[in-house]
Amino acid sequence: MNDETNKNNSNINNNNNNNNSSALVLVDNVRYDKAIIRPLPTKAYYGLEYPANVQNADKAIESVGGLSKISNVIKSREKEYLQLKFRPNNPTCKPTFGTKSPTCHLLLRVRPNKQQTQTQTQTQTQDNNEEMNSPKPTIQSPKTTSRSKQQQQQQQPQENEKFDATIIALVPSTIRFDGLCDFQYLIKSDNNNTKSESDNVNDSSSSSSSKTVPITKQKDQYYVQQYSDNNEIMKDEPMNLIPPLFSRIDFPQNYLFKANPNAQFDKTSKQFVFAKQTTRKATGHAKFNNVIPVAPQELPKVFGVNELMKKTRDILVALFEKRPIWLYISLLDKVQKEGGLVAHTKRVLPSLAFNFVDGPWRKCWVKLGFDPRIHPETSQYQTIDFRISEQDNHYPSNQPSKNNNNNNNNKDSIKNKEKDNSNKEDKEHKEDKEDKQEEDKENNETDNNEKSNKIDEESRDNTKNTDGGEDKNNKNIVEKKNNNEKGDDNNIDDGDEIMKNKEDENGEGNNNNNNNNNNKEGVSEVQKLGRGHKDEKLIIQNGVSGETKINPSRKKLLDINTFEFNSQLPTSSSSLSSSSTQPLLLLKGGSGDDAQDFYQAPVYDYTFKTAPSMLSNLYQIIDIEEPSIAEYWASVKIQSTCQKKFGWFSESSFREGLERMKARFGVMDNKMRFKSRSNTSTATTTSTKSTQPKSTQPKEPKLKSTQPKEPRPKGRPRKYAIKKDKNNNNNVDNNNDDSIDKMDLDDEETTTKSNKQNKEIDESLKNDTLAQMEKDNEYLHGKNEEIEIEIDGGVVGGFDYDDDDDDEDKPFELLDDFDGTDNIQMKQIDDFFGTQTNEDSEEDESDFDEEEEEEEEDFEFEESE
């Protein structure tokens, strides 16, 4: 068996050697001989790619500058250029530049096989001899052979001719002329008179009569001297000042022009037509007075592949079947809760619904084909634009509300009061700390004396009383509890320090453990209500007295939304005190009776359960869950027609609903969209006072200030007197904030406001005329001349015409307005406006001032609340 295997292997090796020697390769059903494997040479040659057909190598090297220039470019480590001039004798010739670039090439030498050529020449000679010996034909053929044909036949390889190729060397780098040739400027000579220098040198047939004379340049003038037999004036030769380079660009720029992939070729016009719209289409919008869209938009191309997008579309279809009109915020909330994506809703929603731009369903998405202007039951889906001020908002944020400007006047007073209260609390805490530290020192001294006596007794009676340590521990526990009851009002840090001092004094381990347990039960602790909550607050709860203390950085206890936790949490002070013995453990992993097993992430709740925040101001009536307000909107009568502003409700019922919401939740924005056009005169002149928050609590009659008012000057106009009284009254009211009481808001308040506003309009016109007349009097009065006024026209004032020369140097002085005389001007103005004089109308003005003061005081009281 071994002999047979050895024979087979030897046969296989012989066949392989034969195949290698005369192996054929099949490529496209054509057999080729295998190439012989040969080693690479070690020599290195450098190449020069000449950009022309080289017939004479010597001239080609001279045009480059010689071998020295080539070797310098190859040997240089820096980037150098090799200049190539196609016309080296012409000074105006612009060179092209070549650079050295690394390559990995092989230099081949290809030669024809000499043995084969010799055999072919012998056969050709024999054939020619046979032709010579053969008889000549009767018809002579024309001579077709010539030198050119013979040369071509010699140059062209024969069919059966073979060549030998050998690798001579490696080419590691070559010089290439990849750059562009510069613009070539050729000087043209004048055929009549002038010629170039090269032409003059080579021209042997020039006439002897005319001689060329060089140009002579003088200082003042430049001209050509004439020296010829014909006395012809010779022309100036051109300067021919050529720049060294015409073009700054050496290498061409590869623009890579490509056809637009979105373009389509039109055979009729034979042009490329581009897509008109490459981006996503906009969503469908509709106005209240326009026709609603019915046709859906096309779904994106990814819809057929993306399953999540299909799922979100199915969710949206189910939501629009339940409810045909949705706000975008509430729609996103529902989609997210059911497992959809927000990014997909934006792309899929235009294929199912359209958006209302204005009207009672502003910023709502309505199902395609559904017209809410026809169906009266869509009144419950109408939107309400509702905001509250920052002071009434239970969830403060950094974004400003629209009516912040109305409350800027009294913010400083509220902040100052809060600072004063915090300072008082800090002082009280410091005093309590000092007192308690003194008491602790006294207690420590007494404890040390008692302990020293007890230790001596225990050392004597260790063998007799084995249970003495336990009794001692119980006594220490009782003493520490009493000390903790004394310091209930201390902060956490004070309690910890006291306990540490007592633990250091007691040297036994059992006492330390008992002390730590007592500390947990008796000392106040910090609890954090809802980690991650936006209104996160720290509450310090005392375990003994049941009092709740607020971190001074947080001034209010905020209610926690119940939807953020699985169980309701105590928010009031009474509920916190009831559970004081066992602190609230609301964090994940807590323990205890009131502990929360797990924390549920807060989810956006779009319903109108509590006062709206400043972030969202649009709500649908169906989302209002306040029972009193929901019952009102359900009981409102619906009109027969749908209006643009109030929808299916009347103006009175809509405004009444807003007033109810205002009384329940806060202040309505003064820049709301729904304003009546009937009271245009009052709406334009209303000040910020009328839009301030009004509380619904009953008010008691106001206590007037006891300070006397300053007497009004007789001759001073009313405008300035009223302003002065207002400032004085405001100062008195600010000093006596405690004297401001509450008053009722009756239904007659609206009528009184309109009357007051009309009075303000009349007085504003009156004050404007008085101010203008006073300005005129200041500039036109004389020094001692009386005032003259005519309402219908005429003299308004006059100058003091004194002829005294001494008065010329005096400065211009204004006359006194009224020197205790009767006020003629005020009487005439009162007669013109149909009012009383200044003295007779003091009582009416004082009453009006008191009414304005009452409004201002009410506003300040409400802000303080």
From Swiss-Prot:
InterPro entries: TF_IIIC_su-5_HTH, TF_IIIC_Tfc1/Sfc1, Tfc1/Sfc1_N, TFIIIC_tauA_Sfc1. GO terms for biological process: transcription initiation at RNA polymerase III promoter. Keywords: DNA-binding, Nucleus, Transcription. Residues 7-21, 115-126, 140-158, 199-210, 401-411, 508-521, 677-696 have a biased composition (Low complexity). It holds the Pfam family Tau95_N. One of its GO terms (molecular function) is DNA binding. The keyword Nucleus applies. Residues 800-820, 839-865 have a biased composition (Acidic residues). It is found in: Nucleus. GO terms for cellular component: nucleus; transcription factor TFIIIC complex. Belongs to the TFIIIC subunit 5 family. This is General transcription factor 3C polypeptide 5. It comes from Dictyostelium discoideum (Social amoeba).
